[in-house]
């Protein structure tokens, strides 16, 4: 690889670095050389991550080389045994220096590379693998949730439960995987590869039957660079638990645009009345089994880590804490009441929680958690208690008393206590717990407006509004350098002021692309000349919502491939979707590009992204609607065809009346001076929204040869205060005095921009792997529950047939057979209803019946392909089916056409009374067929009943059954009624069969 001398250090880069990359690497090396801190901004797509890794590791390698020379010198001197004129033996002195140098690792710093999410860390490790520094030792630290391979631990729900179960098994020496770490940690399969990400660690762990979680920690001491999430560094409890040593370490915080919030959150904590109540119950429970004969069943003759006196004292303290919280007055039941920071210390002091005994109590709580886990494991008849309340209390004490007594004046300025009423958890059909019957906190959920606040359960929030606390704790660990970097850090001065760290190097890089590769416009009015402004007063305006939809529709006709649309919030996204469905705009947009909505669930998110990336390969592309600050806007890669344009529909301001937002603004106003250059409360409020916009914009234009459009569809973007907070490279495209442009000229310019780009820019090759998402399918076969199935059809593409697309067909086939949960019923999406009404043009392949295909895939935005083509060569024709009259004959005809295709033999079909009529196997075809037999109102009721059944229980099932027999009870529709059986939850199928039989 080419070598460049940057700041005196030879740096090997995969190609000749661009000027912005050279400037960035120079700043990094200067920080490392001088032991100073840096704040460096470089737009997404400028090779920031690669520049970070190459420059920092080049400096490390140079230092290692220098130290090797020093070692050789000392070794040569150690071999010289002649006595000098002073009587000192040089060899002995050199040998001593050699020993001391090795013990101190020769003073060569190590790199800790931290980012917000593990997907971002995975991307960084990919960059490292393709660099000249792939041979340097690296390791990634992950959570038990990602790395644990013990089947019983992985069955636990929730990360905290997995942590406790793991600790219990390690403590009791019952985890064979962890016990095997010591004997397998030097195995070539584990020590051989220099770079192993999370997936690699899990594979090696499974192969060697060795715990990847604990094994990864064995690599830290020898690693030149360690990858980890932010919270491992900034959270004091996580840092302690993972035994992270930061002395003489280079800390790189990538994607640091949210670093202030992360620092504030790491120093904040919350405890609820119910947490204290459960802790009291758990202590009482331990005292009971501690003194009973049954305790011998799981404790044996080993000395216990605590005494009955310890438990008695802790229970007394918890009862006093409950009493103290009971006495807290909440003046405003709706919004809560704010107290100064000293109130938290006074509250804890009433229960005798102090600086003096904090450490010993936290240690006791940790022992009690382990005790409960062992007790529950060894006595299956006991109620499973996992000590979650003890962990909450331990976190509270650790964070509150982490602030030393000598800085209490600063604590009082930077922290606030906010008390809210705790909402009751509804346990329908279950008897009230004992604590509730006795009037304890678990029973204080009947929060009526006329009851006094002292009779209510409380939520005590200890909030930090000064991110400098988190950074100060980091600097106090004697790190060598801290480098903050992101594509959206500006303005830098307020950021540096808030973090309160000395910064010697700062940088705002321009973008790497030419002006001709980016089209940026502010769209102030829609095609109907309605003003586009997503403020509080206008967001419910039907005319505005309609105009915004028309704008997106017109843009979707012009933009090739992927179109991203970001909304200020989920409620605004849902409001627009509902309105556009009703008006028909949704179907019009979907006809141009299949629409995908950002889901909130982790599993659904991965699946949706895979389907979107696949749909991009269709000639029409796809449209993804997401939310600023959501998962899509934070770190995902929409390079090249995946994202040719991004539409920002509004400014995502934080909730104005949120207590935390109010208190943050007050903190800034109270502590702002000319010297510290803090923002005003209003400036911070505006900047918080604009940074989220900058981050969303950064999803497109991901490399030097990429191109795309950025459309800001809110007239407020022309305000000078908003423009100045946009990234520097975007401001350059808007000009000195940005103004809203008329919609007509924008459409013409946008069309010309893409026509010119497609003619002059290098077009990307077809990608074989999708960014940050695991390739979960195989070309030849897919394994599902130990059954292998080969693709049923082969698809050919002929020139000129835009409707026929092999990749789209492949997507539909493979996504249909990829099932993550065997009994999962997910949300209906707007596309399902549009498809059922026959208004979309893109369909996905029908596949053989599968007990999970319909309901478990309801969150998919990929419609179905109907195989009605009578042409040769097994070509699949994607067509638009017109609404036909609701006659049984039409349905039968469609069914006959489908019989041309042979299904696999081992698929079970549902019982039917008719040999000629079967319910369609495809979700969309099933909905479409139901739609043919019932009217619009009945179909709406049908959809609502299914949505209710998704999260409901027996009552929702009864409602669904009543409606199904009403709508589909006629003889000619019986096959549809029977066909829905395979989409029911397992516990309801027997009852369904019984009712159908009668």
Swiss-Prot record:
One of its GO terms (cellular component) is nucleus. Pfam families: ARCH_RTEL1 (PF23109), DEAD_2 (PF06733), Helicase_C_2 (PF13307). The keyword Metal-binding applies. Residues 426-454 are annotated as: Disordered. Its EC number is 5.6.2.-. GO terms for molecular function: 4 iron, 4 sulfur cluster binding; ATP binding; ATP hydrolysis activity; chromatin binding; DNA binding; DNA helicase activity; DNA polymerase binding; metal ion binding. A motif (DEAH box) lies at residues 254-257. InterPro entries: ATP-dep_Helicase_C, DinG/Rad3-like, Helic_SF1/SF2_ATP-bd_DinG/Rad3, Helicase-like_DEXD_c2, Helicase_ATP-bd, HHD_RTEL1, P-loop_NTPase, RAD3-like_helicase_DEAD. It is found in: Nucleus. Residues 7-324 form the Helicase ATP-binding domain. The modification Phosphothreonine is found at residue 887. Keywords: 4Fe-4S, ATP-binding, DNA damage, DNA repair, DNA-binding, Helicase, Hydrolase, Iron, Iron-sulfur, Isomerase, Metal-binding, Nucleotide-binding, Nucleus, Phosphoprotein. It catalyses: ATP + H2O = ADP + phosphate + H(+). It comes from the Eukaryota. The keyword Transport does not apply. [4Fe-4S] cluster binds at residues 148, 166, 175, 211. ATP binds at residues 42-49. One of its GO terms (biological process) is male germ-line stem cell population maintenance. HAMAP family: RTEL1. A probable ATP-dependent DNA helicase implicated in DNA repair and the maintenance of genomic stability. Acts as an anti-recombinase to counteract toxic recombination and limit crossover during meiosis. Regulates meiotic recombination and crossover homeostasis by physically dissociating strand invasion events and thereby promotes noncrossover repair by meiotic synthesis dependent strand annealing (SDSA) as well as disassembly of D loop recombination intermediates. Belongs to the helicase family. RAD3/XPD subfamily. This is Regulator of telomere elongation helicase 1 homolog. It comes from Drosophila willistoni.
């Amino acid at each position: 690889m080419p070598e460049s001398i940057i700041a005196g250090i030879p740096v090997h880069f995969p190609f000749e670095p661009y000027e912005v990359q050279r400037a960035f690497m120079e700043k990094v090396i200067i920080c490392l050389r001088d032991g100073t801190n840096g704040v460096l901004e470089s737009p997404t797509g400028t090779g920031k991550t690669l520049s970070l890794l190459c420059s920092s590791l080049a400096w490390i390698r140079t230092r290692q080389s220098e130290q090797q020379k020093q070692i050789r010198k000392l070794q040569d001197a150690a071999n010289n045994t002649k006595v000098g004129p002073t009587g000192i033996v040089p060899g002995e002195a050199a040998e001593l220096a050699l020993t001391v140098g090795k013990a101190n690792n020769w003073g060569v710093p190590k790199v800790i590379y931290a980012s917000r999410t593990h997907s971002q860390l995975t991307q960084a490790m990919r960059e490292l693998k393709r660099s000249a520094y792939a041979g340097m030792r690296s390791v990634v630290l992950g959570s038990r949730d990602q790395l644990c391979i013990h089947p019983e631990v992985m069955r636990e729900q929730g990360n905290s439960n997995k942590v406790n179960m793991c600790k219990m098994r390690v403590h009791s020496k019952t985890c064979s995987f962890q016990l095997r770490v010591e004997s397998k940690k030097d195995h070539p399969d584990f020590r051989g590869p220099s770079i192993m990400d999370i997936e690699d660690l899990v594979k090696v762990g499974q192969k060697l039957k060795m715990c990847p979680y604990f094994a990864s920690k064995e690599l830290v001491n020898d690693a030149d660079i360690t990858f980890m999430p932010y919270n491992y560094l900034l959270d004091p409890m996580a840092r302690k638990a993972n035994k992270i040593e930061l002395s003489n370490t280079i800390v790189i915080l990538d994607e640091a645009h949210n670093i202030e919030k992360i620092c504030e959150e790491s120093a904040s904590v919350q405890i609820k009345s119910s947490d204290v109540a459960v802790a009291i119950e758990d202590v009482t429970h331990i005292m009971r089994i501690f003194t009973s004969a049954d305790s011998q069943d799981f404790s044996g003759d080993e000395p216990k880590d605590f005494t009955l006196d310890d438990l008695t004292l802790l229970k007394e303290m918890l009862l006093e804490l409950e009493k103290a919280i009971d006495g807290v007055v909440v003046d405003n039941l709706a919004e809560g009441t704010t107290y100064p920071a000293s109130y938290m210390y006074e509250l804890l002091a009433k229960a005798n929680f102090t600086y003096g005994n904090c450490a010993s109590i936290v240690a006791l709580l940790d022992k009690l958690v382990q005790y409960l886990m062992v007790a529950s494991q060894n006595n299956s008849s006991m109620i499973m208690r996992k000590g979650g309340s003890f962990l909450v209390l331990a976190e509270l004490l650790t964070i509150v008393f982490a602030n030393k007594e000598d800085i209490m004046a600063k604590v009082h300025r930077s922290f606030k206590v906010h008390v809210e009423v705790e909402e009751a958890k509804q346990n329908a059909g279950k008897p009230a717990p004992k604590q509730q019957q006795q009037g304890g906190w678990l029973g204080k959920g009947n929060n009526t407006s006329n009851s006094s606040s002292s009779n209510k359960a409380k939520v005590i929030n200890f909030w930090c509004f000064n991110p400098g606390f988190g950074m100060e704790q980091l600097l106090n660990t004697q790190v060598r350098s801290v480098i903050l970097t992101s594509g959206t850090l500006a303005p830098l001065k307020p950021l540096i002021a808030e973090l309160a760290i000395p910064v010697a190097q700062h940088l705002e890089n321009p973008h790497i692309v030419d002006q001709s590769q980016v089209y940026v416009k502010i769209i102030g009015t829609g095609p109907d000349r309605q003003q586009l402004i997503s403020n509080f007063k206008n967001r419910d305006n039907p005319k505005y919502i309609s105009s915004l939809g028309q704008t997106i529709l017109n843009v979707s006709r012009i933009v090739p491939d992927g179109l991203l649309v970001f909304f200020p919030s989920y409620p605004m996204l849902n409001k627009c979707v509902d309105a556009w469905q009703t008006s028909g705009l949704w179907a019009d947009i979907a006809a141009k590009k299949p629409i995908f909505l950002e889901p909130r669930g982790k599993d659904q998110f991965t699946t949706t992204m895979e389907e979107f990336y696949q749909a991009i390969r269709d000639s029409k592309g796809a449209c993804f609607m997401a939310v600023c600050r959501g998962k899509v806007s934070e770190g995902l890669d929409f390079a090249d065809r995946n994202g040719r344009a991004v539409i920002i529909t509004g400014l995502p301001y934080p909730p104005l009346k949120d207590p935390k937002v109010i208190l943050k603004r007050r903190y800034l106003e109270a502590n702002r001076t000319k010297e510290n250059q803090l923002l005003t409360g209003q400036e911070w409020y505006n900047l918080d929204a604009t940074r989220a916009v900058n981050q969303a914009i950064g999803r497109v234009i991901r490399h030097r040869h990429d191109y795309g459009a950025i459309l800001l569809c809110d007239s407020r973007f022309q305000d000078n205060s908003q423009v100045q907070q946009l990234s520097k490279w975007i401001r350059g495209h808007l000009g000195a005095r940005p103004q809203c442009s008329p919609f007509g000229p924008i459409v013409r310019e946008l069309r010309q921009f893409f026509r010119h780009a497609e003619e002059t820019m290098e077009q990307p090759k077809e990608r074989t792997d999708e960014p940050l998402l695991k390739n979960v399918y195989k070309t030849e076969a897919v394994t599902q529950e130990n059954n292998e199935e080969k693709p049923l059809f082969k698809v050919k593409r002929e020139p000129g047939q835009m409707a026929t697309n092999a990749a789209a067909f492949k997507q539909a086939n493979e996504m249909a057979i990829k099932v993550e949960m065997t009994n999962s019923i997910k949300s209906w999406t707007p596309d399902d209803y549009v498809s059922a009404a026959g208004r979309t043009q893109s369909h996905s392949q029908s596949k053989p019946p599968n007990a999970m295909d319909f309901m478990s895939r309801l969150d998919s935005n990929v419609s179905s392909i109907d195989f009605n083509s009578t042409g040769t060569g097994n070509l699949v024709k994607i067509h638009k089916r017109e609404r036909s009259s609701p006659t049984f004959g039409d349905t039968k005809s469609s069914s006959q056409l489908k019989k041309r295709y042979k299904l696999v033999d081992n698929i079970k079909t549902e019982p039917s009374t008719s040999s000629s009529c079967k319910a369609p196997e495809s979700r969309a075809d099933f909905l479409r067929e139901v739609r043919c037999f019932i009217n619009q109102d009945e179909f709406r009721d049908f959809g609502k009943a299914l949505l209710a059944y998704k999260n409901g229980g027996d009552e929702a099932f009864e409602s669904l059954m009543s409606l199904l027999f009403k709508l589909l009870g006629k003889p000619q529709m019986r096959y549809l009624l029977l066909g829905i059986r395979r989409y029911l939850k397992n516990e309801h199928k027997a009852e369904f069969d019984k009712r159908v039989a009668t």
